[in-house]
């Protein structure tokens, strides 16, 4: 039988990828825990939209967040074993998505109040979770090394989610 519990965290510590242990209230755990929360919220967004292109983008974002989560959950030894990290090309892909979506949805004429439909509201929840993650990463970067690409990706991700919510709000007959 495969068990998902190890009992090693019962004392309030957790293992990083690489083997070292840290307290469960360490800012790194807060960061990768928020990444996990965001991945789950993007799954809710995926289930809420009927637009195939948005689903494809959301799934790609989830995969990149797993990459980020692995980096945040790694110690120095673990970092050397990672096969992938967020790079400049990932940031550029988000910028292209934002530009396409904003061109399609048109200029903003007023502040956006979330809730026009379920899918857009869920995307706005994901956007605010992303902003929280960004604040955590900024705080984390004050005491620990954090690659600039990771922080920049999260900054763009919140804008990408906003642009996707705008698509949901401005596309007729897509209310989920």
From Swiss-Prot:
Chief place of localization: cytoplasm
GO BP term, pick one: cobalamin biosynthetic process
One GO CC term, this protein: cytoplasm
InterPro entries found in the cross-reference section: CblAdoTrfase-like (IPR016030), CblAdoTrfase-like_sf (IPR036451), PduO-typ (IPR029499)
Positions with a binding annotation for ATP: 6-14, 24, 131-136, 155
NCBIfam families referenced in this protein's UniProt entry, alphabetically: PduO_Nterm
Membership in a protein family: Belongs to the Cob(I)alamin adenosyltransferase family.
Name of this chain's protein: Corrinoid adenosyltransferase
């Amino acid at each position: 039988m495969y068990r998902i519990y190890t009992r090693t965290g019962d004392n309030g510590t957790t293992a990083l990828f690489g083997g070292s242990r840290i307290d469960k209230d360490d800012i790194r755990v807060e960061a990768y825990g928020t990444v996990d929360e965001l991945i789950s919220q993007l799954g809710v967004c995926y289930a809420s939209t009927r637009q195939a292109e948005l689903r494809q983008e959301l799934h790609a974002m989830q995969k990149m967040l797993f990459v980020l989560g692995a980096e945040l959950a790694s110690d120095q030894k673990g970092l050397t074993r990672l096969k992938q990290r967020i790079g400049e090309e990932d940031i550029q892909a988000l910028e292209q998505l934002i530009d396409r979506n904003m061109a399609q949805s048109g200029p903003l004429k007023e502040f956006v109040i979330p809730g026009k439909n379920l899918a857009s509201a869920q995307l706005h929840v994901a956007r605010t979770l992303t902003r929280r993650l960004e604040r955590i990463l900024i705080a984390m970067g004050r005491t620990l090394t954090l690659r600039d690409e990771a922080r920049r990706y999260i900054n763009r991700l919140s804008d990408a989610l906003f642009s996707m919510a705008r698509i949901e709000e401005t596309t007729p007959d897509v209310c989920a």
